[in-house]
Amino acid sequence: MLSVREFSNISMIKGPLIYVQGVTDASYNELVEIEMPNGEKRRGLVIDSQMGIAIVQVFEGTTGVSPTGTKIRMLGRGLEVKISEEMLGRIFNPLGDSLDNGPPVIKGEKRDINGSPLNPAAREYPEEFIQTGISAIDGLNALLRGQKLPIFSGSGLPANMLAAQIAKQATVRGEESNFAVVFAAIGARYDDALFFRKFFEETGAINRVAMIVSLANEPPVMKTLTPKTALTLAEYLAFEQDMHVLAILIDMTNYCEALREISAAREEVPGRGGYPGYMYTDLATIYERAGKVLGKKGSITQMPILTMPNDDITHPIPDLTGYITEGQIVLDRALYNKGIYPPINVLMSLSRLAKDGIGEGKTRDDHKDVSNQLFASYARAVDTRGLAAIIGEDSLSEVDRKYLLFGELFERKFVSQGFNENRDIETTLDIGWEILSVLPESELTNIKTQYIKKYHPNYRGKK
């Protein structure tokens, strides 16, 4: 660890950045204390150091900072936040300061928010089902313990509601008491942050939720620190307290915009879409902090939520996120306009690990077959709608008209559910069987006969 060094030769202040001359031994991400002539102190991080100039990113912004009379102290260590199980039920900013008028964290350990590298050979493959209570996720795109599964939303779509509902309802069945949620609100508007807080408090979910919040009007560095602090807490709860932790990060688009703002202030050569060329690597350092570790009982499951600019799934943020994570849940504006909540487009959504965490002994024996059949039948229903728009519904065959009915029931009964409706996996699969029953049995080609005889409404209850 480096010793504390003090400097006073500020060469330039630009946006949230301070350029300090005469620094030859600064470390990347080294914590800095800025003392102004009036005694006010602020904090920052070294984000670059070359040719004797250190660039310091100030947490509280540089407004009011003078190039003369200001002291810069390099503290010889990275940003550390005191972490404790006491943070569950509380709200903090990315620096670990209380935002709920409660006491500071007394008992705890100081941890570097950048985390520790995890040996890939020490990872354990995700295989345990997490029940979110959302049919379109549990039934068709199951979330597994240790997985990273993002939600791609659009401006104005109810991503906040879905995030809050999942945070309230998600659980590992049989281990409910050992489940916690770390909820990171990145660059949130004040009314959104208030919505999350009130919702968790009113529903009682706050007792198992720790909130890490940065607001939209805060400097960009606070937004970049938010997911890192949240995941540092998640790592502590998972790997030292043996808890199953779901980390919900909303909105990762705000994180990437903060990266772009900082990069522009540093006058870096922009990459695709004006974002820094290292954004892929930066996102990977966040998303790869999910997982299970051999020999550890706990786990970290991630659900990053991002807003696709102009609903463009090929935009750099969702595009790069998709490369790193293990699938995606896509919210659809057309479904939202039809009054469907949550407006999940199941045909564009995917959970790459789902097949390993569902079925007999994990959820229910018919889960895989029902999931495959629902996908196939809904895909045909969507194709049939397109055909009906061209030739007219009257020209369709009897079977095609049943697929149209199936498509409508699938959206209204299976995908759509109430904001406070928590469906267990058995209820989800039973609803799937109910809407599949409108199709002839001969069309259920993806389901084994034994499951049709056991679960189909025409046979259920019969000996």
UniProtKB/Swiss-Prot annotation:
Main location: membrane
Topology in the lipid bilayer: Peripheral membrane protein
Protein's GO biological process: proton motive force-driven plasma membrane ATP synthesis
Ion transport is among the record's keywords: yes
GO terms under cellular component: plasma membrane; proton-transporting two-sector ATPase complex, catalytic domain
UniProt xrefs under InterPro entries: ATP-synt_VA_C (IPR055190), ATPase_a/bsu_AS (IPR020003), ATPase_A1-cplx_bsu (IPR005724), ATPase_F1/V1/A1_a/bsu_N (IPR004100), ATPase_F1/V1/A1_a/bsu_nucl-bd (IPR000194), P-loop_NTPase (IPR027417), V-ATPase_su_B/beta (IPR022879)
Keywords from the named record: ATP synthesis, Cell membrane, Hydrogen ion transport, Ion transport, Membrane, Transport
Record bears the keyword Cell membrane: yes
GO molecular-function terms, A-Z: ATP binding; proton-transporting ATP synthase activity, rotational mechanism; proton-transporting ATPase activity, rotational mechanism
Family the UniProt entry places it in: Belongs to the ATPase alpha/beta chains family.
PANTHER family registered for this protein in UniProt: V-TYPE PROTON ATPASE SUBUNIT B (PTHR43389:SF4)
UniProt function note: Component of the A-type ATP synthase that produces ATP from ADP in the presence of a proton gradient across the membrane. The B chain is a regulatory subunit.
Protein name: A-type ATP synthase subunit B
Organism: Saccharolobus islandicus (strain L.S.2.15 / Lassen #1)
